[in-house]
Amino acid sequence: MICFLMYFYYMEQPQIDHWRNLFIDWLNTNWAQDDKAHDLHHLHRVWRNCKKIASEEPDHADMLVLLTAAYFHDLVSLPKSDPDRKNSSWLCAEKTVDLLNKEFRKFPSEILPAVHHAIHAHSFSANVQTNSIEAAILQDADRMEALGAMGIARLFYTAGLMGSNLYNADDPAAKHRILNDSSFALDHIDVKLLKLPATMKTVSGRRMAETEAAYILDFKTKMLKEITED
């Protein structure tokens, strides 16, 4: 089985590299992204996470579907404060299929529905069921970006964009108040980030998420200590 997968990987790799280079060239030319938490480097990292998870899952994933969904899953990305944000991934999936049809005419049309579903289902706010291994892997790979050291960096970067406070100075640990991650960045760790491992769809994704969530919990503990000690 391992030998077969290695053979399949090496047969796929030239095609994957070809399409990846085309996608990156297009994005560098046509995709201006002011939100640096969702820039081209984010797409590179999500793709890397996809490869890592796919390599450990027993079900074979179509790597071209994964590659395409990874690099275009934020083609439409509405701000967290936008009331229509829950529809962002659907709009993104629609735009991606349209783009592939118009700009990448040699892209295999038979996998367009799989690309559409993976992109549509990846979003946390959309709450769409994943019906393919590619959708499950992409969702986990993207959520991994919210955990670990990178997750902390992106958390406070995004909080700065939104004009949020770092924490509630009167009650930073939220012992006597309701958590409010719209106003306090530190609250987002408990509101969402520490819950992410339980939402992972793949076994390997959950294992990775649990490790990175522990890192975030250690960070929160240390930050609270620095805030509260005299």
Residues of each region from the PLM?
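Short, well-structured alpha-helical segments
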Residues: 40, 44, 63, 67, ...
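An amphipathic alpha-helix signature
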Residues: 20, 24, 47, 89-97, ...
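Divalent metal-dependent phosphate-bond-processing catalytic cores, especially two-metal-ion Mg2+/Mn2+ enzymes
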Residues: 12-15, 31-40, 44, 48-58, ...
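Short, positively charged and aromatic/hydrophobic N-terminal segments
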Residues: 7-10
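Short alpha-helical hairpin
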Residues: 13-28
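His-Asp-centered metal-binding catalytic motifs of divalent-metal-dependent phosphohydrolases/nucleases
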Residues: 61-82, 88, 92, 96, ...
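Hydrophobic, well-structured mid-protein blocks that either form specific transmembrane helices
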Residues: 99, 103-136
